[in-house]
Amino acid sequence: MRRAIRSIAALCACACKPNAVKRAIGAIPARFRCREDQAMTTPNAENEALAKQCDAVADAAQGAIEWIAEAGDVVREEGPALARDFRREGLRARKLANAARRPMCVSVFGPSQQGKSYLIASLARKEGKPTTIRFGEELRGFNRDINPDGGKESTGLVTRFTTRPVNGLPGMPVVCRMLSETDIVKIMANAFMEDFDRDTVIPLDSAVIEASLAKARAKAAPAAVGRLNEDDLYDLFEYFERYFLNHPTHLALKPGAWREIESLAPRLSIADRVELYGLLWNNTPTMTATALKLVQALAQLDFPEEACCPMLAVEPKAQSIIDVETMSHLGKGDGDPVPVATRAGRRAELPRAVLTAVVAELQLQLEDKPFDFFDYTDLLDFPGARGREKYNAAKAEEVAQSDLFMLLRRGKVAYLYQRYLAEQELTSMLLCLKHSNQEVRTVPAMVRNWIDGTHGATPEARKGQDVALFLVLTMFDMEFEIKGGAEDNVERWSTRLKTTIFEFLGLGHDWPSEWVPGQPFNNTFWLRNPEVLNKGLLDYDANGREISFRDPGRVALLKGNFLANPDVQKHFADPERAWEAGMELNDGGIGYLSEKLRPVCNPALKRRQVQGQLGDLAKRMAGRLEGYHVSGDLDAELAKRRAEARLVGRQLLACAEAQAFGLLLRELQVQGETLAELFRRQQLAAAETPSAVTAPVGRKTTARELRSEFEALFEDDPAPTAPVEEAEEGPRDQADLFAEAAVAEWLQNIHRFAARNDSPELFRMDREAIATLVAQLAAGARRLKLRENIATRMRTEAAYNESMANRLLKPVMIAERAINDFVTWMGFDRMPVEARPKAGREGRSIFVRPPAPADDMPRLSETPIAYDAAFYVDWAVAFVRLVEDNVRGAGGAMVDEKSNARLGSLLNGLRKVAV
């Protein structure tokens, strides 16, 4: 204690001397230092500055939502889609702020049983000493007392090794990060959607979904009843949009149903909202009951982010919460109770199996610092990725009853990676792959998602960045086995790289072959475990330490072939050094790997990653708002937009070259089924609201017209005082209501398309180009009054009697045709041919059909005429003109100067971050 007081006094005395401060802090015993990620008493100034910048962008997103709500006459039908966009971006900015405040991490990841254990053990211990963990005043050996025994994959949570103090509560030194309610939902849904063959999934009928929603409506309170809010539910929706976009269960929940779930769930009791969540796993009873049990356990603690337990939670290690097998008791007694407490004072006793299921991370404080980079870096050990099953979904309840543990285990392991990826926790990754064929086919996509988020989705984006991905080829000594029929030649090494890189990581992904322009990925390392005896390769002393190779001649031959292999030269930055490191006695490659790891274990790397993503985020946000801001310099705005439009046009032609243009148009159009469901829900809502206007018949009549007719009776009388004219309000009849809803639904769909992660790769267009495309189509729809045109046509078409079936079908057909025609022709089909934009060197008018032969007999040439190519060019030219007309139209519009100034202020703030 005295030493601590002296050290703190020294710290105060040298507060103005940074280096002296560091020395003084280092002199304070670890157990007296505050926990960095909780108390934040000595935050890194740069990290905190970046976090505040992220917070400012999140605040700007909220400001944009408020502006959208006030500017309904400007954003019109696009308002709901824009508001959802900015809600998503605001959540993303908050996650980046949290990431900036947390320490950087090196993650060890890979499929199950890939030799990760030796790598973790070696990185987490000081040379020559066992890994020792501090729990308050007690010490435990990690391998001796905590880590489960056996050669099987054993963990079902993330293990964090840190040298920062991990301070629990009195008598409860075991500190855990907990799952949230929506985490539980994601895990259950992941288990169902990944482990049941989607071809056997029969989606829930719309009547079943509607019945569940109606039941929830009847039980919903007027306001939220707990911590859950609509942002949590929106984040849940975004999870399914990202990972299960085309799964039948997700598709069955049309956007309208999802929006109701977002609104209803926070206002329901736990039991009622978990029942509503059951729609995400096809109402499988056992899965719903298990989800309810886990959510209720979290509710006892008031849904904490962190909780503390006594040593009982990890001892004895055969029953520890770190051992995933402990979770196998779920539904089978659930195990003995374990006390759990939160820093807010909540306490509960949770069954051991339940506690194991709801813990996301176990935090372990290392007694000894293994490497100097642990001063600012934590080591994360992820449970091994597992292959997924293909159960018959028709037997979902039967499978859930008999195999609940494995379902939950696979779902949780997969989701934990996704959660930490979303939270930007994985600054660097050590990807471990062994020599045999890889069976966990989901790993390449998981790695690719991380690369896209941390380094960039293209070789150009990754250029100039520190490489934070380390490909670790484990079990190097297995390469020296003499295999029947296999020769010790150069091709031997291509076979190894084939199983890990070419036919696994590179299958469907181009980053291994081109990490940066013109250069393949080459941050590859060998790793060998000296603790596993290989007497066919090495000789050992009496203590089991390696002393020499048994056949140096063969080792030299294999090394020569390795160095001569062209694939090796591509994928190893320094093949000879990698070989020598892997063959180093009693080391196996750890020394070389840690040496290369040290430079990227730098807080500046994480800041660059977060700053890069924040800049992209701010740029996207500004891009979505710019179309609504009226610039004082119309010529400059026109030049800027014209340049953007031409860039999009070129990418549209690249999309056409990839034969994806037709699919792009389809994504930009609206589906008739979607509008039919929308119309059905609108009719149901109208039926439940006695005052609702339900008849889309005739034309809309305004109060102004009625007053005009009435006053005409009294033209000879003195003119009365002119009444104050009321502003025309929003939709007045069913035609207006449905037209507005249909256009809003279409706009939300194309905004969702622009936000999808797979869109750039599928359509050969970058994210900014797709966002511009969507924004300008929306602006064109407003300018050309697409909603009003649909409503007018509905009134015209419905102005005569017809069957009930046609009355229900026709509005959908009208809206679908109008929206999809707009996407196809952008309004230029209604323009006289001579007034249309010109395309091609010959200056032909766009979208002109070739003249029909006089005798109705087509003239066929020897080579087919490329009508599709002409259409692609016409569409790109039409888009450029659409953008120009949008700018000119905005320039002549009436402007609310106060609203426009507020929008300009938001844009200025975002542009500063986007630089």
Write out the residue ranges for each language-model feature.
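Non-catalytic alpha-helical scaffolds
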Residues: M1-T159, T163-L431, H435-A468, M478-V915
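Active-site neighborhood of phospho(di)ester-bond hydrolases with catalytic His/Asp-centered motifs
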Residues: V472
